[in-house]
């Protein structure tokens, strides 16, 4: 996210905060995943005196009987403006979907599935299932671009 902001914003200053999403450990559905991103952005804006804050959240959703990864982002401004954007979606293999549907969080399921640790903080499930052509960071960077693009449309002189 910082690389995108450095490209698009004038002299940005970054404050990285670990704020709670206040949704399930494994958000299920677009609504809950988006709510997690909203909660993170609002909380980050509240905790620090910032011009804007980003909230990003990954989750899973059902579509036509298949379980997909989904991800959402929110840009919240100090003036209370909110910009929303969703990212790429990809179906999960049956065995991964079954474990997540039974109540397990995707991160630990992916660690078992791949026999690797730290999947959620590295390539993510999307990296595993796209042969690392698209990584978790790529998905969230795309969302940040969508958010900033909307913001710049409303604030062309920034």
Q: What do these predicted ranges mean?
A:
Residues 2, 13, 17, 56-58:
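Glycine-rich beta-strand-to-loop/alpha-helix junction loops that act as flexible
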Residues 26-158:
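Anionic-ligand binding patches
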Residues 10-24:
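A short beta-strand-loop structural module common to alpha/beta enzyme folds
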């Amino acid at each position: 996210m910082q690389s995108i902001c450095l490209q698009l914003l004038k002299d940005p200053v970054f404050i990285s905060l670990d704020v709670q999403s206040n949704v399930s450990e494994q958000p299920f559905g677009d609504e809950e995943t988006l709510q997690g991103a909203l909660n993170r952005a609002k909380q980050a804006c509240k905790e620090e005196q910032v011009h804007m804050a980003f909230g990003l959240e990954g989750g899973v959703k059902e579509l036509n009987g298949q379980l997909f990864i989904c991800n959402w982002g929110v840009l919240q401004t100090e003036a209370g403006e909110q910009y929303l954007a969703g990212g790429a979606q990809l179906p999960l293999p049956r065995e991964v979907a079954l474990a997540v549907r039974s109540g397990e969080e995707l991160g630990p399921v992916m660690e078992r599935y791949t026999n690797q640790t730290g999947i959620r903080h590295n390539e993510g499930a999307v990296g595993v299932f796209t042969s690392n052509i698209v990584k978790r960071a790529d998905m969230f960077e795309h969302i940040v671009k969508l958010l900033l693009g909307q913001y710049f449309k409303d604030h062309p002189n920034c």
